[in-house]
Amino acid sequence: MNRLLSVFALGGAVLLAGCVAPTPSPTTRTMRRCCRAPRCRQRPTTVRSTRPVSSRTCTATARRSGWVTSSPSRSMSATSASKNAGSQIAKTSKTDIGLTSLFGSTPNTNNPFGGGDLSLEAGYSGDRATKGDSKATQGNTLTGSITVTVAEVLPNGNHRRARQKWLTLNTGEELVRIAGMVRADDIATDNTVPSTRVADARITYSGTGSFADASQPGWLDRFFISPLWPF
């Protein structure tokens, strides 16, 4: 009898456990929270900007922290810089001291090292010259677009945006990073901002791998071109 009651109790517990909804995993909760669409509040609010926005109507323009937008860099396709510098310093000095007599007499002493007699005459001459030339030329081209995130909304309505993109290739990785400040009025209806409209822009394009290592000088070359090198 006791064994039969135990079997019924175990079966009831299994049935109750099957009726309980499964607990979502942390990944599921995170995805639901990230992919949740923003709701339109009925209470009107005004964004501190030159153009007021009411939350009664949903807008696709990214104006709040965490929203994303695209920043094409087609308008800044090429930049170049060149610098030349040259310096030359020359100095020549010569000194002659000749005394024919000392207190009315002409000293004449034999030179113990040979080569004639010692006298009161002395002379010095020296030349020094320094010359340096330097030339630097730099050019780059960057074309494409990157999606950035609104990192911060300032009290005046401007947005701080930053994002980076990593491209993994079979010979290394390439990094494209852009950060800067954007006005809310410069955001187009398709959520794009030209790179020429980004204030305090910091654009980084670098990479890792064999190609990036090939463009760097070796450790011995870096030693000889160091600013601490005296020559």
From Swiss-Prot:
Residues 69-82 have a biased composition (Low complexity). It is a lipid-anchor. InterPro entries: Flag_Lring (IPR000527). Residues 1-18 form the signal peptide. It holds the Pfam family FlgH. It is found in: Cell outer membrane; Bacterial flagellum basal body. Keywords: Bacterial flagellum, Cell outer membrane, Lipoprotein, Membrane, Palmitate, Signal. Belongs to the FlgH family. Assembles around the rod to form the L-ring and probably protects the motor/basal body from shearing forces during rotation. This is Flagellar L-ring protein. It comes from Pseudomonas putida.
